[in-house]
Curated annotation (Swiss-Prot):
GO terms for biological process: amino acid biosynthetic process; aromatic amino acid family biosynthetic process; chorismate biosynthetic process. Its cofactor is FMNH2. It comes from Acidovorax ebreus (strain TPSY) (Diaphorobacter sp. (strain TPSY)). Homotetramer. This is Chorismate synthase. Its EC number is 4.2.3.5.
Length: 366
């Protein structure tokens, strides 16, 4: 299986399966000399961890990260950093009834046809469990970018199923299980309680933002910053759409309003989402993700088995009724990995470029 590594200079290779003994990643290309400990990584893993509310999977994994290599006396050495997360709460017996059939909307069918076999336990390699190493690697990238450029990452949910979530303030996001930017989440609690009782699932929309991104990241024509962002975001489980800046809303805009006016005091707007011509402008990078409903649900559905015969599928086990609820820290990590890789590439090629005129300020829209 190929496709398990992302990045050019900051390379991350992800390994493991949902019900295997462990999952993890190897980071190659991290600059030496950065202070790094397990605690630096664990904070983000705890934000993504399962079993933290009644609205997510009740699989109880501590997701304790172990640094196996690449750090000596508390600092990165420049050699590959191996990160390991042990699986401790697998319940493989829950998947015996679907080992010979395919879940509608799941990767089961495609994996079986491509590889000739599949691991049905928790989805195997296609499980969202494999986003934990991504978050771990993203924490390393976040730390370096914060120390080098002051870059910060944050994400929130802007829609849960049919319910839009109005933006109030980023300060609310850490204080509710939905990563919602609102003070009152009772409507979303009630919605998820009813959804879970019905045996169904729902999708979500996620907004992710990077601030204080340096100007000049991105490599035209085919390694554009926004192209790479879209590429890795589509690699996140259940993502079916990616928008940069105004995204699909730009279809209904006129050129007089879509173009972000430049003034000596700064940009007037940020419809471009911080990227022009595939290169960062110094504005906030703004990305939105459309996440489909979870395919593993307890409601019976029509499918076929591995012999091509009709069957009814009921998925037991512990699943997220909305995978979007835990997607915010994962989206942050993926965005950080792309920006980290492009920052190192920019430094390698254009590190000596100096402009007489400083970049203009970014507009701050919340």
């Amino acid at each position: 299986m190929s496709g398990n590594t992302l990045g050019t200079l900051f390379c991350v290779t992800n390994f493991g399966e949902s019900h295997g003994p462990a999952i993890g990643c190897v980071i190659d290309g991290c600059p030496p000399g950065m202070e790094l400990s397990e605690a630096d990584i664990q904070a983000d893993l705890d934000r993504r961890r399962p079993g933290t509310s009644r609205h997510v999977t009740q699989r109880n994994e501590p997701d304790a990260v172990e640094i196996l290599s690449g750090v000596y006396e508390g600092k990165t050495t420049g050699t590959p950093i191996a990160l390991l997360i042990r699986n401790t709460d697998q319940r493989s017996k829950d998947y015996g009834n679907i080992a010979q059939s395919f879940r509608p909307g799941h990767a089961d069918y495609a994996y079986w046809h491509k590889y000739g076999l599949r691991d049905p336990r928790g989805g195997g390699r296609s499980s969202a469990r494999l986003t934990a190493p991504t978050v771990a690697a993203g924490a390393v990238a976040k730390k370096w970018l914060a120390e080098k450029y002051g870059t910060r990452f944050r994400a929130c949910m802007t829609q849960l199923g049919e319910l839009p979530i109005p933006f109030e303030n980023w300060e609310h996001v850490p204080h509710n299980p939905f990563f919602a930017p609102v003070a009152d989440v009772q409507a979303y609690e009630d919605y998820m309680d009813a959804l879970r009782k019905s045996g169904d699932s729902c999708g979500a929309r996620i907004r992710v933002q990077a601030t204080s991104v340096p100007v000049g990241l991105g490599e035209p024509l085919y390694d554009k910053l926004d192209a790479d962002i879209a590429h890795v975001m589509m690699g996140l489980n259940a993502v079916k759409g990616v928008e940069i800046g105004a995204g699909f809303a730009s279809v209904a805009q006129r050129g007089t309003t879509h173009g972000d006016s430049l003034t000596p005091t700064g940009f007037a707007s940020n419809n471009a989402g911080g990227v022009l011509g595939g290169i960062s402008t110094g504005q906030d990078i703004e990305v939105s993700l459309a996440i489909k409903p979870t395919s593993s649900i307890i409601s019976p559905r029509e499918s076929i088995d591995i012999h091509g015969q009709s069957t009814e599928v009921i998925t037991k086990g512990r699943h997220d009724p909305c995978v979007g609820i835990r997607a915010a820290p994962i989206a942050e990590a993926l965005l950080a990995l792309v920006i980290m890789d492009h920052a190192l590439r920019h430094r390698a090629q254009c590190g000596d470029v100096v402009q007489a005129v400083a970049p203009i300020p970014a507009v701050r829209l919340g």
